[in-house]
């Protein structure tokens, strides 16, 4: 049960967790109301391959024999921002290019789950996909989902074929951005007060940290969308509907993200321990593609590029997202914006296909060499 926490000197602000739980419920109810107006999700057909505590592994129907993808959404909101509507869906774009698309859906995650458990869940899903398609999947992650995917690639280097990071924060310190003041204003371990941190509380914190992006920007996008035409107007409200799908995070995860990553930058320093082993960017030895927004205050480009530069990747692809009308939050634009689907995702998906061609060629040459030795 969430209780009002009395204010204690140097112990952070008093927070009524029960109030924010009720606010989460009200926001989800508002989202259901928008569904009745035709503004709800219209996901591509998929089936659940596996379900366990906190997660589901989905495989989307269609596609072909192309690259195997494992999408790792941010656990903060619903997974279907990757498949918001047919005209603005990374999932459908990948299926149309023959990819085998899988997605890790975060469910009611146990309160005991921290970074170790979330990263392990990504690794298990990657292993399950590999067992199904007989090849390592490419991990794709947005925001905190990308952070978890990168940590998985560092801790479990044999599980991923490559990484695709979409505005995923990984380097902090001077690259923390607008969230730095918020994190530094709270005492270490603050989020451990909660078994689960309500999604609306996280949203309020983000809005206070960067009102230009999470408040003013949404209103300005609504106005621009109305002037831009019905397509942009509708997509704006589809994105707003998605923001109402509140998902609480375990207090343990939030505390570890705030303290170990944002406050202490342990991953970049090589002092982050995952499941008993220290990890660092140099442990990531797979190709990395990254989409950054040079305008972003929430995930500054340096928070992503700093990691890419420090990783031991044999190949990299760095793309810049410049913004769109009709995305509500520009932080979502790289997933749902017109320019992203016109300019960025075709390049990313072709890059993945080229990686697979190169990998298949190397495997064929290796098999031929082994066969030749056997014949001799």
Regions found by a protein language model. Give the residues of each.
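Alpha/beta-hydrolase-fold enzymes
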Residues: 1-11, 135, 148-252
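Short, surface-exposed "cap/lid" segments of acyl-processing enzymes
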Residues: 44, 48-107
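Conserved acidic catalytic loop of the alpha/beta-hydrolase fold
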Residues: 109-112, 120-137
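Gly/Ala-rich beta-loop-alpha elbow adjacent to hydrolase catalytic centers
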Residues: 140-141, 145, 149
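Short beta-strand/loop motif that positions the catalytic acidic residue
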Residues: 284, 290-292
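Acidic catalytic loop of the alpha/beta-hydrolase fold
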Residues: 294-299
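Short alpha-helix in the alpha/beta-hydrolase fold that links the catalytic acid
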Residues: 300-310
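Catalytic active-site module of serine/aspartate enzymes centered on a nucleophile-bearing elbow/loop
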Residues: 317-376
């Amino acid at each position: 049960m969430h209780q009002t926490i009395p204010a204690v000197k140097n112990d952070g602000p008093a927070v009524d967790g029960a109030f924010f739980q009720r606010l989460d419920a009200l926001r989800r109810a508002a989202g259901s109301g928008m569904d009745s107006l035709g503004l709800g999700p219209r996901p591509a057909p998929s089936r659940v391959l596996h379900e366990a505590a906190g997660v589901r592994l989905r495989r989307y129907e269609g596609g072909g024999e192309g690259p195997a993808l494992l999408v790792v959404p941010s656990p903060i909101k619903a997974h279907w921002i990757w498949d918001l509507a047919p005209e603005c869906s990374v999932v459908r774009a990948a299926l149309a290019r023959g990819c085998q698309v899988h997605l890790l859906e975060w469910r009611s995650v146990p309160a005991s789950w921290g970074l170790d458990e979330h990263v392990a869940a990504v690794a298990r899903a990657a292993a399950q996909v590999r067992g199904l398609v007989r090849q390592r999947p490419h991990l794709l992650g947005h925001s905190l989902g990308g952070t978890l995917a990168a940590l998985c690639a560092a801790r479990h280097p044999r599980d991923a074929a490559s990484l695709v990071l979409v505005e995923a924060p990984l380097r902090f310190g001077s690259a923390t951005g607008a969230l730095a003041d918020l994190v530094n204003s709270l005492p270490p371990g603050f989020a451990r007060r909660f078994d689960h941190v309500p999604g609306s509380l996280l949203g309020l914190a983000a809005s206070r940290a960067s009102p230009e992006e999470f408040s003013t920007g949404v209103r300005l996008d609504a106005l621009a969308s109305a002037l831009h035409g019905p397509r942009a107007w509708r997509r704006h409200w589809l994105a707003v509907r998605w923001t109402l799908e509140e998902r609480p995070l375990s207090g343990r995860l939030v505390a570890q993200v705030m303290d170990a990553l944002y406050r202490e930058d342990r991953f970049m320093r090589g002092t982050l321990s995952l499941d008993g082993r220290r990890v660092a960017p140099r442990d990531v030895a797979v190709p990395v593609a990254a989409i950054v927004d040079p305008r972003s205050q929430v995930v500054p480009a340096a928070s992503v590029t700093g990691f890419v530069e420090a990783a031991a990747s044999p190949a990299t692809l760095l793309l810049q997202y410049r913004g769109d009308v009709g995305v509500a939050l520009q932080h979502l634009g790289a997933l749902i914006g017109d320019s992203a689907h016109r300019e960025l995702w075709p390049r990313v998906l072709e890059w993945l296909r080229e990686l697979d061609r190169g990998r298949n060629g190397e495997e064929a040459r290796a098999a031929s060499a082994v066969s030749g030795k056997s014949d001799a």
